[in-house]
C-alpha cells in the first residue's frame, strides 16, 4: 500500500503557476525578498553562523532563503515538492554561481533517508501549506543532528492575522495574490509549541515579524500576532 504524501495538490499548483516570477523583486514574491534578510540574520545569530555547516531548507520554493544561506558558506540542500519552483531555483543558482543542491521530496521521505544529517534545518512559511504540519515538524526533528538548530516560521490564527494577512495583504494592498493563504491553516504559537512537545525539539526563542504599510518595510519584534519565527534545538 502506497503511503499518502503530506502535500496539498492545490497548494503545489498555486506555487507552480507563479514559479517563473519567483525572483522578480517587484512580483508576487516581493514580500519574501523583503523579509529574507531578517530571516537570514535571525538564523545566523541563533545558529552561531552557517559557514561550513550542513543546512536543509524545507519547503524552499524558488530558493530565496536557501541561496542566501549558501552564500554564507553553508552546504545547503533545498527541499520542495514543486517541480517548477525547483527548476527556477536551480537556474537562478547557476546564474549567480551559487553552489547548493535542490531535491524534489517531502520532508517525511527525506527524513527516512537522512536522519541526524543536518546542523541546521529551516522550515519557513511552509507549515500552513501542508495537511499535517506535525508530521513535517517531526521530520525536521529527525533530520537535525543532536545539538543542532531547527527554525520554523508561520502565521498566527486570530482576527488580527486575518485582517493583516488576508484582508490587508491579499485584498487591499495586494502584496500577495488572493488565495495565497487559508486562515484556517494558520497556526497559533501555543499550538506550534504543543506540536514541538511531541518531539525532542526544545523551544529556545520566538519572535514576531512585522510589516509597516506606511514605509513598506519589515522588522522583527516581540509581537507575534501575525507572522512569527520559532527557534528550537535538539
Curated annotation (Swiss-Prot):
Chain positions recorded as S-adenosyl-L-methionine binding sites: 39, 59, 80, 124
Superkingdom field: Bacteria
Keyword Chaperone: no
Enzyme class: transferase
InterPro entries on file: SAM-dependent_MTases_sf, UbiG_MeTrfase
GO BP, one annotated term: methylation
Keyword Manganese attributed: no
One Pfam family from the record: Methyltransf_23
Known EC number: 2.1.1.222, 2.1.1.64
Alphabetical UniProt keywords: Methyltransferase, S-adenosyl-L-methionine, Transferase, Ubiquinone biosynthesis
Reactions mediated catalytically: a 3-demethylubiquinol + S-adenosyl-L-methionine = a ubiquinol + S-adenosyl-L-homocysteine + H(+); a 3-(all-trans-polyprenyl)benzene-1,2-diol + S-adenosyl-L-methionine = a 2-methoxy-6-(all-trans-polyprenyl)phenol + S-adenosyl-L-homocysteine + H(+)
One Gene Ontology MF term: 2-polyprenyl-6-hydroxyphenol methylase activity
Pathway noted in the entry: Cofactor biosynthesis; ubiquinone biosynthesis
Its job: O-methyltransferase that catalyzes the 2 O-methylation steps in the ubiquinone biosynthetic pathway.
Family: Belongs to the methyltransferase superfamily. UbiG/COQ3 family.
Protein name listed in UniProt: Ubiquinone biosynthesis O-methyltransferase
Species of provenance: Aliivibrio fischeri (strain MJ11)
Gene giving rise to this polypeptide: ubiG
Amino acid at each position: 500500500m502506497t503511503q499518502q504524501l503530506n502535500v496539498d495538490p492545490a497548494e503545489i499548483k498555486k506555487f507552480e503557476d507563479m514559479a517563473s516570477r519567483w525572483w522578480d523583486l517587484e512580483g508576487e514574491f516581493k514580500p519574501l525578498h523583503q523579509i529574507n534578510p531578517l530571516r537570514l540574520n535571525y538564523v545566523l545569530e541563533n545558529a552561531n553562523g552557517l559557514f561550513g555547516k550542513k543546512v536543509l531548507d524545507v519547503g524552499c520554493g524558488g530558493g530565496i532563503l536557501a541561496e542566501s544561506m549558501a552564500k554564507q558558506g553553508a552546504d545547503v540542500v533545498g527541499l520542495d515538492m514543486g517541480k517548477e519552483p525547483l527548476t527556477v531555483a536551480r537556474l537562478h543558482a547557476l546564474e549567480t554561481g551559487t553552489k547548493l543542491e535542490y531535491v524534489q521530496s517531502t520532508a517525511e521521505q527525506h527524513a527516512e533517508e537522512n536522519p541526524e544529517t543536518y546542523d541546521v534545518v529551516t522550515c519557513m512559511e511552509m507549515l500552513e501549506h501542508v495537511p499535517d504540519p506535525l508530521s513535517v515538524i517531526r521530520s525536521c526533528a529527525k533530520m537535525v543532528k543532536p545539538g543542532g538548530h531547527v527554525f520554523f516560521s508561520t502565521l498566527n490564527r486570530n482576527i488580527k492575522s486575518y485582517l493583516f494577512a488576508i484582508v490587508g495583504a491579499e485584498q487591499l494592498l495586494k502584496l500577495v495574490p488572493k488565495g495565497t493563504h487559508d486562515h484556517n491553516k494558520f497556526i497559533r504559537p501555543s499550538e506550534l509549541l504543543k506540536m514541538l512537545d511531541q518531539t525532542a525539539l526544545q523551544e529556545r526563542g520566538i519572535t514576531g515579524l512585522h510589516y509597516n504599510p506606511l514605509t513598506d518595510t519589515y522588522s522583527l519584534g516581540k509581537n507575534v500576532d501575525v507572522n512569527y519565527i520559532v527557534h528550537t534545538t535538539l
